[in-house]
């Protein structure tokens, strides 16, 4: 019989290799699932299928996993390397798969009793033939059930390119023996647990059935909240109930997605072509976190940072290829233009207006629609920043969607809701040229199909894209920890804890996004070149600086989730030089090569520097203090950092608390000393003159931030009673003048939002009294600290401009 099965598998192998593509999930199971290939592995499959076996085996061999067709040999005993939990619809029958599997499990357990060093790993594996969840009003089932030979043939032809082999987290048999013993009941329990795992996996791979849009509309329009809103609309506008109902239907039709699985399959093919045209690859990290939440039955809300319109497509594409369900995506109403709007809607987009203010009917309908998505178990994605960042930094969170998410949790949400922060990064953003024009004052160009096609047509060879899933926030756990009485409040009204909870969770999402930053060659090369006042460095200086950056990021990690480039400084530079439309040039003179950034590209490059500015701001501040003082006691350096840190923390969403900050600063000092960038003797720090250029380049990372802070506190010294609005306006005007006089190219330098954030942080840190008047002694102390870290030339320009402004206004 074994020979017949082998012949049958060989016959299947040729057509399947032509029809079915290798799509393993995860892409690198050995690394991502922490598999120990030096210990025996047993693959656990849900049911007998020779077709599935051939596909699964081919993936194993391509991934460097042990061949499932061969046997494990342990202490002279040979046992199968795979088991089936159930009979499938197969030609070759044998004794029951259940009994056979239990017998094999028992033999492996017996070997664990006699060999203490043995640790067999059980790896659940399933082959997913297509991912359609089916429709609510139809009886069709997803193609994850048992298929007979004819059905498998059609599945291979139709779904061959969409067939995935899913490897799950291994179960340690050694752990099972230690925790539960090794009798026959344990073998049966293992089989039951594996069956439950496969059942959950089916749901996590396809998601709930797609809704009947009309039936969903009818249900929502009958909900109490929307009926009340329709009645209020009719009264307030003096129109009939029927007319108000038509308006409600029109709003719902404008908002709601119209997901089509066939459309998702089509866009998957388009996106494969697009990524191959534009990018050299998509680097995905920590997707196991999300798969774990999906298997545990969590309602998942993806909250990515927003760099580009292409973010909408990228995250859905990545999730689909990680064996997860693409989410329903909250997209700006500006993207609802022909034909893109209809296409996006079929891919899961639901559209949201820029503001709900004053429109109670729209607000009620949108809130109920979002709550219905959660209730039905669909994953959701929204961009908490509200729009795309034009500067490359995270924007302050807009809390409206988070507020509605918490309201859904309040109102009878039975499944746990987990927020998954997502860092999305690119070595070249499609719209970066447009952002630069907008920051220089150009009007925002309205989105249309022609604009999208023109942008894509012009671009290629844009390097890599990055998606890193940050630390999830399970809302019920977070609320229980920080707001213990959240369940006891009256759910009909907004309780006292609600607004602080929304604000705190939104801020924590931003912090977790920054903790998951993916550093790339563009970020590092751009940071180094922009740190030089002339935007140019010798090749040797640049490589030395890149090495210093790399060493510090590795030896003093910002967080365990940060992803670092695993290449040499030389390779980083060559990679950036090979990218299109970057503006990094090589010039030669008698002394060697100079790497220079074109002036016109300086604003573009600040975008990529700003992506990782939060990683470098503390080392930069340490470098800046030591450089300006030349020699300083550690205690004094720490005091200066403690004064400035709350403002950096608020602006850049840094995650260190007071104790963690002290540890991080000491580690940075030790790393600078290890690199010989500074001298460290007991409590005394000083510059190392032979490496002062490295320290200068490090210090540049906070140069413009400290200058901005100094502008605002100097105005407050001169005008302690100035209003907040006037303070923001005058700070912005002084910064604009400073940028012209001193050639500052950073687009955020005179951005009103960063001054608004700094002033809000001043208030939070009690630099204003209850009446809003400046606490002068605190402001003067902060101004004194800042003035020691800013060049005399800048200080004089700031003071002179403020005095001139006073003279003009008096």
From Swiss-Prot:
Keyword Lipid metabolism: yes
Subcellular location: Cell inner membrane
Pfam families: Acyltransferase (PF01553), GPAT_C (PF19277)
Motif (HXXXXD motif): 305-310
Pathways involved: Phospholipid metabolism; CDP-diacylglycerol biosynthesis; CDP-diacylglycerol from sn-glycerol 3-phosphate: step 1/3
Enzyme class per UniProt: transferase
Main location: membrane
Gene Ontology CC entries for this record: plasma membrane
CDD domains: LPLAT_DHAPAT-like
Gene Ontology MF annotations: glycerol-3-phosphate O-acyltransferase activity
BP GO annotations: CDP-diacylglycerol biosynthetic process; fatty acid metabolic process
This protein's UniProt keywords: Acyltransferase, Cell inner membrane, Cell membrane, Lipid biosynthesis, Lipid metabolism, Membrane, Phospholipid biosynthesis, Phospholipid metabolism, Transferase
Family as reported in the entry's similarity comment: Belongs to the GPAT/DAPAT family.
Protein name (Swiss-Prot/TrEMBL): Glycerol-3-phosphate acyltransferase
Organism: Haemophilus influenzae (strain PittGG)
